[in-house]
Swiss-Prot record:
The gene is rplX. This is Large ribosomal subunit protein uL24. One of its GO terms (molecular function) is structural constituent of ribosome. PANTHER family: MITOCHONDRIAL RIBOSOMAL PROTEIN L24. Part of the 50S ribosomal subunit. HAMAP family: Ribosomal_uL24_B (MF_01326_B). It comes from Zymomonas mobilis subsp. mobilis (strain ATCC 31821 / ZM4 / CP4).
Amino acid sequence: MAAKIKKGDRVVILSGKDKGKHGEVTQALPQEGKVIVSGINIITRHRKPSQANPQGGLDRMEAPIAASKVAIEDPKTGKATRVRFDVRDGKKVRIAVKSGETING
């Protein structure tokens, strides 16, 4: 199946604690059905002091979020949209359903 969400896409979060926020996909994990979005689903890890990190402390990082909880941001309106595929100039391209605009990538 073709990838509807790819690295570099602008997405809107549909549900959860970050609902309504926008971000960019930094990593797609298609085998797991998850994506990592910049600034979304931030988790905190408590790190013990070690030789590599003598101070220890709190590490904040982005955790994967289910791909079903994000939607592509429409390039024209900035709202969530579904994606369909079409062949234009002999190439398969992704198209935003709401506006008909081509999605880069």
